[in-house]
Curated annotation (Swiss-Prot):
One GO CC annotation: cell surface
Source organism, top-level taxon: Bacteria
Keywords for this protein: Cytoplasm, Glycolysis, Lyase, Magnesium, Metal-binding, Secreted
Name of this chain's protein: Enolase
Hydrolase as UniProt keyword: no
Organism of this sequence: Chelativorans sp. (strain BNC1)
Active site per database record: 204, 336
């Protein structure tokens, strides 16, 4: 009764007002799964390809070709297949595409179908998505990385790092973690306003004030944590997303906002120093995606005490992750479903990380929708951490609200990851 009888792809708009792909999958028993595909602003060179139309329509960002692939070739290939066989369905679509990066049909087309198939099958099974994907062991609520201050590609200010995040590691429950984050977010807003800074929010709901450098941003966050009544480090830690590929030029890290240029060793030492001066427990993309020597230097220097997350470095790709593990670089992978383009490959990346004692952080993209699938996947994989934006914008809050519901559903079985995510 789980045979796929219909697939409907459509073009909808994401949180930035750009087109994206949404897919409905209908099963023989009438069960329906719907998934919408996110889109990134700072994308790694090794990501699966998001198919865009080009031309004047939507200023070149239309996804009509990807939708056509969903309604045409993909439906013809997997229509009639049993939706329970997720691996076979995903492999069929990957083989149909026939390219190493899903550039013919589009990762946005393949992923939309892949996630919708899983959601339809969960509905047919009478199970929530996290339970269907993760089985009986899915019970860990992730620590949120809450993006409250922005720079880099996410802002028009002098700060070169892309994201400054808070992690409520000392909260007793996910619901409390969300409350703590909200209280700090609003305290920060008041502090910025009092200091004469702009408090408009960016793509991911964080503030983008005109601060001079990373230290100024970190000092504002520390003050806000304390003023909200929490202890920096013990109760609320800090995480960074440097997005270093964005300012890596000719083998150097060029901090245009600060007027500084650092080589790989100096970059590693700078980040390690910051982690010593502030309660920073996680640094994402501290080095450029192909600066393997820099990554090794950073890992040797800070890897025992700080979570070093590879985003552009690994692009949710199990093969690239295995290479990194063999090189001894980083100790964590950021998991973005649209970087790799199918549920099966996403789960493979998480499994590869966990087998090597690397952590995994489930993540949104800067262009999001009301789809809350990644909240379920964070619990399904027991990865213990989720990165899904600030405490503003409904496209971000949809994920937090879904996690609150999941914690409620799990009842006494629910466990908030808390301080288990802290290294050292």
């Amino acid at each position: 009764m789980t045979a796929i009888v219909d697939i409907v792809g459509r073009e909808i708009l994401d949180s930035r007002g750009n087109p994206t792909v949404e897919v409905d999958v209908v099963l023989e028993d009438g069960s329906i799964g719907r998934a919408a595909v996110p889109s990134g602003a700072s994308t790694g060179a090794h990501e699966a390809v998001e198919l865009r139309d080009g031309g004047p329509r939507y200023l070149g960002k239309g996804v009509a070709r990807a939708v056509e692939a969903v309604n045409g070739e993909i439906f013809e290939a997997i229509g009639g297949l049993e939706a329970e066989d997720q691996i076979h369905i995903d492999r069929t679509m990957i083989e149909l595409d026939g390219t190493p990066n899903k550039s013919r049909l589009g990762a946005n087309a393949i992923l939309g179908v892949s996630l919708a198939v899983a959601k339809a099958t969960a509905a047919a099974s009478g199970l929530p998505l996290y339970r269907y994907v993760g089985g009986a062991s899915a019970h860990i609520l992730p620590v949120p990385m809450m993006n409250i201050l922005n720079g880099g590609a996410h802002a028009d200010n002098p700060i070169d790092f892309q994201e400054f995040m808070i992690m409520p590691v000392g909260a007793p429950t996910l619901r409390d973690a969300v409350r703590w984050g909200s209280e700090i977010f609003h305290t920060l807003k008041s502090g910025l306003k009092a200091a004469g800074h702009n408090t408009n929010v960016g793509d991911e709901g964080g503030f983008a004030p005109n601060l001079k450098d990373a230290n100024a941003a970190l000092d504002f966050i520390m003050a806000s944590i304390e003023k909200a009544g929490f202890k920096p480090g013990d109760e609320v830690a800090i995480a960074l997303d440097c997005a270093a590929t964005e300012f890596f030029k000719d083998g150097k890290y060029v901090y245009e906002g600060e007027g500084q240029t650092r080589d790989a060793q100096a970059q590693a030492e700078y980040l390690s120093k910051l982690a010593g001066e502030y309660p920073i427990i996680s640094i994402e993309d501290g080095m450029a995606e192909d600066d393997f020597e820099g990554w090794k230097a950073l890992t040797d220097l800070a890897g025992s005490k700080v979570q070093l997350v590879g985003d552009d470095l690994f692009v949710t790709n199990a093969a690239r992750l295995k290479d990194g593990i063999n090189m001894g670089i980083a100790n964590s992978i950021l998991v973005k479903v649209n970087q790799i383009g199918s549920l099966t490959e996403t789960l493979e990346a998480v499994e590869t990380a966990h087998k090597a004692a690397y952590t995994a952080v489930m993540s949104h993209r800067s262009g999001e929708t009301e789809d809350s699938t990644i909240a379920d996947l964070a619990v399904a994989t027991n990865c213990g951490q989720i990165k899904t934006g600030s405490l503003a914008r409904s496209d971000r809050l949809a994920k937090y609200n879904q996690l609150i519901r999941i914690e409620e559903q799990l009842g006494r079985a629910a466990r908030y990851a808390g301080r288990t995510v802290v290294r050292g």
